[in-house]
A protein has these predicted regions:
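Intrinsically disordered, low-complexity proline-rich regions
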Residues: 1, 25-26
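Bacterial N-terminal signal peptides that target proteins for export
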Residues: 1-11
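Short hydrophobic transmembrane-like helices used for membrane targeting/insertion
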Residues: 6, 22-24
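Bacterial N-terminal signal peptides
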Residues: 11-21
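C-terminal His-loop and adjacent cap/lid subdomain of alpha/beta-hydrolase
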Residues: 26-474
Length: 474
């Protein structure tokens, strides 16, 4: 595995070679349905592997074409809520590790929200936009009888054509007339972008460089990132990498934005850690009326509930309730004529030093103070304790240091309290559950989690294995 020092040097070289984004216009010319079926895990939905064919007319007078894979999941039988989500598929694996497998793409919007999208009637598409991936695997999957990852095969002329590919995905959801099946998706009214880590860096680049001037996207859910933009250039093999961002918009003249950040994202994005970017402290945008940022305590960049890595100590904090609520709030903020703003931003307590390193204030358990406090960390509400931690959650995992594995490093750790400490904290299950209820009720009432997740958190607390071993209610 490559060391952080080598990655910092490589990143610096890539940033030095980066080109300014090119203003382009694109057109979808056709859509091919490669496979279509009823979704196994989404009742009333069709899952389709498709290929999107498009042309690009660039500002420099040149023209190009792209042929990229996508996964489209759409509701049947009038179940649609007329909102689409474009998942900016994450291919960071191929920028950090040798391409020993095709299965290094991650549809993090699905991983982070579970069945929520399909319970609520959203239309979903994830699309490949990273030229580095299509250059590795080529235009089409081999016909060899083996399983292949549809999302890695395609062709992109220029790396910066990515922006129009991503805009075209939104356009396709709003106008699916080129879809060749008469039972295809219905048009949506509102389209949200959703990116996680690498995808989130691309979203920040789109906003910082004004690459969606006509607001094809109606809103952006930007997850697990610091101030680091994913750049596009035509230098192989990466065709761009994380780099410094231009100033983010501050005046609200952009589609609404919700940013989700974790303890990891406050500290890993720095030249001395991952080798690029700045802390998520610098993506805070408190004067912009169209920007919210929620910083989630006790959560790592890659927690086990979203992406289990098979580690003995990976951070077990579950941020998915916050992700689902953020998506619901962004929908209400952007859909229809009667729109509702999301809850206020929630920041960690702390500051940055002279080197732009975030220095957090921590609680008695070592979790970052402030922010959105799910029941797995402690808080105080109206002078009473809320939340019931079962151990210490950290943002970084030392197992990822030698040899350096960035995925492991940013997965964080969890160390459970001893039985003696748990009994001292919660002499009875009733006391434990009351504290979870207090935290969950507070978060739900203020819109930071949904009511469905409030009930699920309470139900889980009632059956959490505790040293006193009281029976789980039926």
């Amino acid at each position: 595995m490559t060391s952080p020092t080598v990655w910092r040097a490589a990143t610096g070289a890539l940033m030095a070679l980066a080109l300014a984004p090119i203003s382009v216009e694109a057109t979808i010319t056709s859509v091919t349905v490669n496979a279509s079926r009823s979704c196994e895990n989404a009742a009333g939905y069709t899952c389709a592997d498709i290929t999107v064919h498009g042309s690009v007319a660039r500002a420099d007078g040149s023209a190009g074409v792209y042929v990229v894979p996508a996964v489209l999941i759409y509701p049947r039988h009038h179940r649609a809520n007329r909102v689409g989500v474009v998942d900016w598929v994450n291919s960071a694996f191929f920028h950090f590790f040798p391409p020993t497998t095709e299965f290094g793409t991650f549809q993090f919007t699905l991983l982070a929200t579970g069945h929520y999208l399909f319970d609520e009637g959203y239309t979903y598409v994830s699309i490949q936009w990273d030229k580095a991936v299509t250059e590795i695997f080529g235009p089409t999957a081999p016909v060899d009888g083996l399983p292949h990852n549809h999302l890695v095969y395609g062709s992109i002329d220029r790396s910066a054509d990515a922006w129009e590919i991503l805009l075209d995905a939104a356009r396709l959801l709003k106008d699916p007339s080129l879809y060749p099946d008469s039972n295809g998706p219905r048009p949506v009214e509102t389209v949200l972008s959703s990116g996680y880590s690498q995808g989130a860096g691309a979203q920040l680049e789109l906003l910082a460089e004004g690459l969606d001037p006509h607001l094809v996207y109606d809103g952006h859910l930007i997850q697990m990132i610091g101030l680091a933009c994913f750049k596009r250039d035509d230098v192989a093999p990466h065709f761009g990498f994380f780099g410094d961002c231009s100033p983010l918009p501050r005046n609200g003249r952009h589609a609404p934005v919700i940013v989700l950040a974790t303890e990891s994202d406050m500290v890993i994005f720095h030249p001395t850690v991952l080798g690029f970017g700045k802390s998520a402290f610098f993506t805070r945008n408190p004067t912009d009326p169209n920007w919210r940022q929620y910083e989630i305590a006790g959560i790592s960049h890659l927690p086990e509930p979203i992406l289990p890595l098979g580690l003995p100590n990976q951070n077990t904090g579950d941020p998915r309730p916050v992700f689902r609520a953020a998506l619901e709030n962004l929908t209400r903020w952007t859909k229809g004529t009667h729109r509702a703003g999301p809850p206020p931003s929630r920041y960690f307590s702390g500051s940055v030093d002279a080197n732009d390193v975030f220095v957090p204030v921590t609680d008695a358990d070592g979790h970052f103070a402030g922010g959105v406090r799910l029941p797995h960390v402690e808080s105080t509400l109206h002078g009473r304790p809320a939340g019931a931690p079962l151990g210490r959650h950290t943002p970084l995992n030392p197992l990822g240091l030698d040899p350096f594995n960035p995925f492991v490093f940013i997965s964080g750790t969890f160390t459970r309290f001893s039985d003696e400490e748990l009994l001292e904290r919660y002499p009875s299950r009733d006391q434990y559950v009351r504290r979870v209820v207090r935290a969950a009720d507070h978060l739900s009432a203020r819109g930071y989690i949904t009511n469905a997740d409030r009930m699920a958190l309470i139900a889980a607390a009632e059956c959490e294995p505790l040293p006193e071993d009281s029976p789980c209610p039926k």
